[in-house]
C-alpha cells in the first residue's frame, strides 16, 4: 500500500464542511469539527484504513471512496485528539511515518481579476458551491495528490473572506476554485501556499 496524502484539518470551516456534505455518502461532517483526509493506493485498500481508525477511535467516516486508481477516506469528530489518534492508527496499519506521504506538488495556480460576466456564468454552471459574480477575482489551483485540495480550501476559508466555488479531492489531481474580492483572494492564495509548503513528505516529481 502507498500512502499518497494524509492531512489533518483542525477546524472544518463552514463552506468546506458544507461542500463535503454535498458529496459525503457516510456521516456528514459539521463545521467546527476536526477532520482527516487520506489518499491511498491501491484504492481498495481504503477499507483497511477505515477499519483501523474506527476500531481504535470514536471518529466517524464521511467519505470512503474507491475510484479508478486511488482510494479516499475522510474521517471527522469534534474531539481533535480522536482524529489525531485515527491518523496514528492508520499510519500504524500502513507501517509508515506521516512524512512518508507524498509532498504536495502544485501543478497550476492562477489568479484572474475582473472576471467577465460570460466566464462567471460558465463557472457558475459547473460549480457545486457558492456563486462567482462578474467583476470578482477567481483563484484556481491544481495540486497533486488530489487529497491536498481539502486542506488548501479549508485554510483559504479560515484566513480570508472568500467563496468556495468548487472542490475536487479525488482522482489524478485535486482542484479548487475560489471567488471573491482581489485582496481577499490574495490572502487566501498566500495561506494556501503556506499550508502546502508546510506539509513534509516524499519527493513528488509527477502527477501519477
Provide a role label for each language-model segment.
Residues 1-35, 42-50, 57-59, 66-70, ...:
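Positively charged, small/polar-rich N-terminal and surface patches that mediate targeting and assembly
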Amino acid at each position: 500500500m502507498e500512502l499518497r496524502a494524509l492531512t489533518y484539518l483542525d477546524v472544518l470551516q463552514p463552506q468546506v464542511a458544507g461542500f463535503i456534505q454535498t458529496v459525503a455518502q457516510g456521516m456528514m461532517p459539521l463545521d467546527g469539527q476536526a477532520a482527516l483526509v487520506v489518499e491511498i493506493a491501491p484504492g481498495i485498500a481504503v477499507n483497511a484504513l477505515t477499519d483501523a481508525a474506527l476500531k481504535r477511535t470514536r471518529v466517524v467516516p464521511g467519505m470512503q471512496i474507491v475510484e479508478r486508481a486511488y482510494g479516499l477516506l475522510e474521517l471527522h469528530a469534534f474531539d481533535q485528539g480522536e482524529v489525531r489518534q485515527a491518523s496514528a492508527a492508520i499510519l500504524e496499519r500502513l507501517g509508515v511515518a506521516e512524512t512518508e506521504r507524498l509532498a504536495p506538488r502544485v501543478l497550476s495556480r492562477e489568479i484572474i481579476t475582473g472576471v467577465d460576466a460570460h466566464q462567471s456564468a460558465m463557472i457558475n454552471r459547473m460549480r457545486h458551491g457558492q456563486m462567482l459574480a462578474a467583476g470578482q477575482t477567481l483563484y484556481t489551483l491544481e495540486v497533486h495528490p488530489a487529497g491536498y485540495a481539502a486542506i488548501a480550501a479549508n485554510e483559504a476559508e479560515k484566513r480570508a473572506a472568500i467563496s468556495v466555488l468548487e472542490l475536487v479531492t479525488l482522482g489524478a489531481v485535486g482542484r479548487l476554485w475560489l471567488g471573491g474580492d482581489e485582496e481577499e483572494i490574495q490572502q487566501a492564495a498566500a495561506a494556501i501556499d503556506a499550508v502546502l509548503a508546510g506539509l513534509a513528505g516524499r519527493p513528488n516529481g509527477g502527477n501519477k
